[in-house]
Every structure is written in structure tokens, then in C-alpha cells.
Amino acid sequence: MPDPAAIPPQNPFQPEEPLPAAESSPQEVTQVTLSVKLAPGTRLHVTLETLTPDGQRLSSQSLDYASDESQSAVSLEIPASRVPAASQPEPVEAPVERRPGQLAAPPLLASLKTILRNAGWGFILALVIYLATRLIALTDYPMYFFTDEAVQTVLASDFVRDGFRNYAKEFLPTFFYNVYQYNLSVSVYIQIIPYLLFGNSVVVTRGVSVLFSVLPAVSGGLAFKQFFNSRYPWLAVLMLSIMPAWFLHSRTAFETSLAVSFYAMFLYFYLLYRQDHPRALYPAVIFAALAFYTYSPAQLVLVVTAVLLFLSDLRYHLRLPRDVFQKTAGLTALLVIPYLRFYLEHPNENLNHLQQLGSYWLAQIPLIEKLGRYFGEYLAGLNPLYWFFPNSIDIPRHIMGNYGHLLVFSLPFIAWGVFLAVKNFRSSAYRTLLIAVIAAPSGAALVGLGITRTLFMVIPAALLGALGLASTMEWLLRMWQVKRRILAVGTFLLLAGFNFFMLGDALTAGRTWSVNYGLAGMQYGADQVFSEIINYHQHSPETKFILSPSWANGTDILARFFIPSSDPVQLASIDTYLNQETPFDSNTLFILPPDEYQRALDSAKFTELKVEETIPWPNGQAGFYFLRMRYVDNIQEILSNEAAARQVLVQDTVTVGSEDLLVHYSRLDMGPISNLFDNDLNTLIRTESANPLKLQIDFPTPHTLNGLTLRIGSTAATLDLAVQVDGENSARTYHQELKEDVLPRPMTVDFGEALNVTSLFIKLKNTNDSEPGHVHLWEIIWK
């Protein structure tokens, strides 16, 4: 017999859908009438089920019909005698009377169970594939174990050690102090139990994050089936899984992926609330709060999302039952209390956070310029070129080679999904996807575009891509008359295969996507170096280790993660031993990256250098040198000569306007001295090793000056200025200090009156740095 023309074949990854439940009770059903168009000679199999209000199956009846060869339509009447009798469920509490138009409230947990039960084996298999591509070789990709991952477990261990108090002695704190700022919260708390069970482990720390990353995969698949009426919930799971930005970050312990996971759950339960489940607002609010506390850029993303959702569905919200509204408001107030507590205890911390991030909002520029910067960054976060193609904005460790943040092959499907969302804008589910897209870059724009701050985009992108692909599949079914089962299985295998291809590519080619393995790049080596130190110490307990920290951020945090505090490991750069005589003995083993090893060789300050071992970088080159050495016999003489040389000023003549100025200055390793007088704020000088920078400017004829302005960097600075006035025996002195800032800024000295100046002597010091050091200066302007 030919296939039915109007009834699609079964989806191999989805259980058979029940007929919609009648609104009346089972006892009132006397007849069911179906009008179906059939190809001539088609046999029709009908399954009629009765369900409880929460979706539980009570009874089922199957019937078979056949159309004549000449028939193209048939009307089927199923008499009451053939309608399956509905076994009555256990007596339940009488329904609450509701006002006309008020929302109904089906049991939330029962609905969730039904949704999961009907998701199908394809959905379950897709989740297995998702987890497999996250857990396989978890420590090998990303190749680095970053300090921002290690700090989660280190803070958790300190929290347990200190009686569930943070470093400020706050019991069960809202936020934990991370180096310079309070910015970690939920990501620390979720590591406590794993730490107590398994201790410090890269697999465990990352594995916890991976398990939470399943949340958007589950919620995305269920949302795709439940709110977008798709028969392919696995499409959303596999589409999310192959988004490169998510593939990379969901395999790390960065708090950004955790915040995105909670954000996805917030969206899911909000959409469930929009399907006449008012009590779904409770978990929606809880997951929104978890995302809010997990990652600071999520805070503005959530605010923007919540405001737009409120306005978008205002008429629906006004029908919210009073008791649900009151409980939701109470729950929200309860979840705000930890933030209020934190704000009262640390009122300046939000400002400090923006300072640490270098936000332009704190710069001394007009408000209109700040707004322009914000919307410029925001629009850049919506630019498809940023998302689908390689870029130079993000640092290499946050990029998967040439993949782009969103898979370029998904671009046409996502674009078609956006079209469908706009077309179906009257549907709350589609509007929510567009709102999530609009909100995603809002948090990043406060500081600057970066994938960790805009990672929220992967959630709507994956669902939009799944919508576009599902629509394309339906088009293929109509155009090619291909069997649905074959197309579904083929698409599933293609997406699943690409998941494992991406995993294999990351584990092999990914090791050389970037060959910058140092501080400015991948920061490779934490697990490898510290594991070797532990192994070395077990065989040679008398050895003392001096490890350079210059190859990674927060090397002290990494050391605490991998090595017990009792082990003899000291963090120090080779420069500590090059610039001053620092004692060490023959039991000292230096561990240096290539650049520091080369400086030690070239310095002529050490002898008897012996490399005992090397640890290679992923490209095969030596990445770390384990060596022993000692100072040369005349080291004190060499260091004394270098200190004296730093005080010797270089002399040069600089033309400023029509005058030639004689300038004496400290040795430079960046920029000519003329950069200070070219009226260009983009050019600068930097001292080779002197701190403070010393400058003497001699005018050929006296200049009438009222003050002096230096364009300095963001570091804390101290200025000592001596002004020689024509006819005076001694120079007038001025002293000024500026604290650290977020951007380069002017440092101005007002003389208080007009002076006839013959020379200026400037000493500019980085307040918090010692010598040798680097001092930066952009411009000198007198008035």
C-alpha cells in the first residue's frame, strides 16, 4: 500500500504523539469524528488514548480503516462504544475556583516528567554524545589549566579550612575575593563537595563544570520540542554541542559557562511559565539569581532580558494568580538579600570592579562619548563577522583555531531561524529567542567585547540554528519525497559525527592552533610542570625549586592547587637573580621558560649551568628548563657597574617648534625621546630599566611657563619636579602623586604664577615598582 499522504511516517527518535486531550471529562465523550485526506487504497491505523490532566496514560484503543481505490477523503466516526473508557484516577483535591481569564496551573513536576518521558531516545542519545565529547580527554583540551579554573577549588578549600568563611571572615559570603576583586560566588560553592570527596584534581574541577553544562543541552532540547513543537529535540542538543565557543568553554571550569547554563534554565522555565504553568516562575527566578551571582557580565544580561520579557508579555503577566505573584515577589526579595548584604559590607566594590576591568565608564571623557563607546561595543557583539569567522579581538586561548565562535556552516540555518522567529513574532517562544539575542552583548559592552562576556549568545543561536535546520528538513521532505526516518537518522548521524570530528581536531590539530604557549598566549604547562616537580621532589627531597611565574597569570594559585604548601617551591623570576645578588645553593633547581633561560645564558652572571631536564611545548620545542647553576665569582662587581650605568643619562637634541632643546634622559628601550614633544598621544617612550625615569630639559632662552602636564600611564605614579627660574640660585621643587587608574591620564603641576624657566628636571616613578623597572611616558606639555 502507498504511504498516507497526510499523515507523516513515525519519527525514529520520537515516541508516537498522543491525540490532543479533550477539554471535557471522559464520561462526556460520546463520539470522535476525524476527517482525513488519504491517497486511494491507503490503510489508516488510529490509536486513541485517554490521559489524566497531568498527561498520564489511562487507556488506549487501536482501530484500522482502509479507503477505497476511488476515495481521496474519508470521514471516520468512532462511536462511544469504541472510545476507550478512562479509568478514573485517585480522588484529588477539588480544583480552586478561578476568575475568568485567569491562568490554569497544571502540576509542574508531573508536566516535567511527561515532557522528559516523551522526549525520545534520540534526545537521550544526543545527551550521551554531548557528555562524551566533553569528558573524553578532559585534561588535554583545552591544553592549558588556567588560574581562573584553579582558583575555584583553591577558594573552596580555603573556605572549608576557615570554617565556611572567606578571607574577610564573612560567614557564607555572597562573593569571594579573587586577587583584586570580589567576583566569584556560585562557581566556588559548587566545588566544595567535589573537593571534600576527591581533593584537588583537574578532572574533578573541570568535570563539575561539564556536568552543569548539560543543563542548557537538556533545557534546549526540551524547549525545542515543547515550545517550538518540533519532533526533533535532539537537534537543539547537537546544534549547541558543535558551537565552537561552547565546545571550548564547556570543557573548562570558567564561571562564564556556569552562568550561561543557569541563564539557559532561566529561559526554559520562563517559557514553561508562558505555557500556563505559573509556578514555573519559581525555578525561573532561582536560576536567574544563580546566573546573576555567578558571573558579573550576566547581571546586565539578566536585567535586559527580564525587562524585555516583562514588556513583551505584559498582558499575560497581568493574569498571574495573586498567590503566585506574592510568592514570586517574596522569593525574589529573598534572593536579593545576599547582594544587599554584600553591598552594605563592600559599598565601593562595584566601582573597584570596573576599575580592575579598565572600563571606559570611569574614564575622564564626556558622557556622550561613553554612550557611543557602549553602543559601539554592543553592536560589535551582534556582528556576524565576529561570531562566525576568526577574529583578532579575542586572545588565542578562547578561540578554536579558525572555527569562529559559532560554526560557520550553521550560519544559513541560524539566519533562517532568525527569519522564522521574526515571522512568528506574535509567539512568545519566538520573541524570547530574539530577546535573548538582543540581551547577549549587553554585559560585555560595559567593558569591551570578548567571548567570555558574550557567551550567552550560544543559547539562542543554537535554538535558532535548530529551527532553521528543522525547517530545512521539512522542505526536503516535501521536495524530494524522502522518508522522514531516513532523513532524521542521516541528520542525526551527520551532527553526531561532526561532534566527534571536532573533538578529534581539538585534541590533535588544536595543540598547534596557536604556538604562543606563554603569558600572552595559551599559558601552557601548569599540570605538566607541577606534576614533574612533585615527581622530582619524591626522588630528591633535598632539592629546592625556584619556578619562574612569568609564563602564566596567577602562578601562585596554580602552585597552591597542585602542590601542598609544605613542598619547597618558591616563585621567582630569573630577573630577581640577574638584577641583584640573591643567595641560592647547589641544591637549588631553577625552572625557567625559554626567554628567561636565554637571559640567564646571555647575562654572563652565572657559570656551571647544567640543564637536567626539559618539558616540551605541544609543538615539540623546549618549554621549560630545569637547570642548576651558580653565580660567577665577580658578581658583585658586575651588579655594581650595572647600577651605576642606570644613573647615567643619555644626551640628545630635540627640535620643538623652532627651538633646539638639549635633553638628558634615562636609557630607553621603546620610542625616541622626540615622542615626548610631538603632540601625539599615541606615541610614547619607555625606560630600559630605570625607575624613576629622569629627564632634564634645557631651554636655549628662558620660557615663561605657568605649569607642566605629563601624559602618564594608568599605574600609580610619583612626580618630583625641579624648576630652575632665571636669576634664582636654587630650583623650585614640586611633588605630586596619583593613584592607579584604568587608562592613561594627565598629571598636571600648576606653578601658581608665571615663571621664566631656564630648565626642568623631572623624576617620574612607578610608585609600586622597584628598580630595575619600566616607566612609560607619552607626552610633556608646558603652558
Question: For each of these PLM feature ranges, what is it?
Answer:
Residues F227-S230, Y263-A284, A291:
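Membrane-interface transmembrane helices that cradle and orient dolichyl/undecaprenyl
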Residues G207-N229, M265, P412-F419, L467:
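Transmembrane-helix motifs of polytopic, lipid-linked glycan transferases
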Residues Y631-T701, R711-T715, E779-I781:
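Disordered, acidic Ser/Thr/Pro-rich linker "stalks" and the adjacent N-terminal cap
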